[in-house]
Amino acid sequence: MGRSLKKGPFIADSLLRKVEKQNAADDKSVIKTWSRASTILPMMIGHTIAVHNGKTHVPVFVTEQMVGHKLGEFAPTRTFKGHIKDKKGGR
């Protein structure tokens, strides 16, 4: 179930201020954030946002196709190492 249209998309206030500040200054430096739940807005296109995955900040370059998605979708938190093969021969 999605968020109500009456409320609008969620975006952290600090992240929104940083993006607006960079847009006004025409600056495209990396923005570091821990807000994985923030929705990507059209004003973020072209910015590189470093999203925290629990260990490090993963740089995410925002494109037009990402608008409407959450930042956390593009910074995976788990690494799959693969299933262990059974040893042949046994005892």
Swiss-Prot record:
SUPFAM superfamilies associated with the record: Ribosomal protein S19
Gene3D superfamilies: 30s Ribosomal Protein S19, Chain A (3.30.860.10)
GO BP field: ribosomal small subunit assembly; translation
First and last residue of the signal peptide: none
GO cellular component, one term: small ribosomal subunit
Regions annotated as coiled coil: none
Keywords: Ribonucleoprotein, Ribosomal protein, RNA-binding, rRNA-binding
Family matches, as InterPro entries: Ribosomal_uS19, Ribosomal_uS19_bac-type, Ribosomal_uS19_CS, Ribosomal_uS19_SF
GO MF entries: rRNA binding; structural constituent of ribosome
Function: Protein S19 forms a complex with S13 that binds strongly to the 16S ribosomal RNA.
Family: Belongs to the universal ribosomal protein uS19 family.
Protein name, UniProt field: Small ribosomal subunit protein uS19
Gene assigned in the entry: rpsS
